[in-house]
Amino acid sequence: MLCIDSDIGWNAQDVLDMLSYDLEFVGGIYPSRQSNIFIFRPYLKEDGSLIVNDKGLFSMEYVPAGFMMLKREAIEKMIAKFPESRFEPKDKELKNVSGWALFNTEIYDGEFWGEDYVFCRKAREAGLEIWVNPLFEFTHGKFKGKLLDALSSRP
């Protein structure tokens, strides 16, 4: 499954790179549409350093859904972990169609979580690792940048 928001500017080579990584869940982090900031939460080692795999990708707790790729097996793991998310459509004409509510908003620990972050939390709970390439460059609204530059500019 490939998710790309219509207001994100991206490089086609990045999609090919994500395919070549052969990972269950991989994506990119782009600047916010309202300001040139990157919203992310990395998974860190005990010493506070980033977890980086052999491909140079960073482990993340969550990523925005505007640029991510998942294998079918990843979705199947999430469905198996959250069978209660299955639903049947109200429209009886679609009686042989069902779905799973994996992209939904919710209140988690007293805080509102948007659908992309809920999806990532569920992915993590299903045992998936979430990886991002910090070198992918995006535009979003009038802002442009890559995660690595944002990390480099942090104190």
Task: Set out the residue ranges of the language-model regions.
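Short beta-strand-to-loop acidic/aromatic patch adjacent to the donor-nucleotide binding site
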Residues: 1-9
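Short beta-strand and adjacent tight-turn residues that come in two discontinuous sequence segments
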Residues: 3, 28, 133
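Residue-level detector of anion-binding/catalytic polar loops
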Residues: 7, 24, 129-131
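Surface-exposed, flexible loop/turn segments at secondary-structure boundaries
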Residues: 9, 33-34, 138, 146
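General alpha-helical segment detector with a strong preference for membrane-spanning helices
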Residues: 9-11, 120
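Conserved catalytic core of nucleotide-sugar-dependent glycosyltransferases
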Residues: 11-104
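C-terminal catalytic/acceptor-binding lobe
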Residues: 82-155
